[in-house]
């Protein structure tokens, strides 16, 4: 079942066709990657796959909120057949763990890890939530304010509710907020050499 689950993810190639107007705001080098409609009369159509490389760039750059919403929903609800598989995998893992004398599959897997028990992990998550909530709230407020200012400056988006930050809005306005602060990911990456970063991650997760 796990093989079927993973194979469906690898083979998944669904997506959406958008006209160029719907993709207004997309960088040309990103737009050039998208497949074009074969029929001559439809050459203004581009195909955005539900995979991360395509969906993230549409969510991050497309000015049209309807475009971002369609991309978000399509990507979020891809592979519906995997839902039942995942439920069955979780069910069987739990049953196997119980047969081995563990309370759950999580308890079985954690026995050889640094975090020995589910209770330890839960406590850690709660501490992280408390520590990060204020910062996360402030960042969300900043993104919401960026949406308001953007809508005020762009009168063609009059149908948008400036007081609502939808899930498909976050990447777009977060990008604008970072650009306002002149955050360049390429410059940030200079502080994280590949070899050192990979070794640190492996040590953390081992």
Task: Locate the predicted segments by residue.
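Catalytic nucleotidyl-transfer cores of nucleotide-processing enzymes
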Residues: 67-68, 72-82, 86-89
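Active-site-proximal, well-structured secondary-structure segments within enzyme catalytic domains
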Residues: 3-51, 59-60, 87, 92, ...
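Short, charge-rich amphipathic alpha-helices with coiled-coil/heptad character
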Residues: 58-74, 112
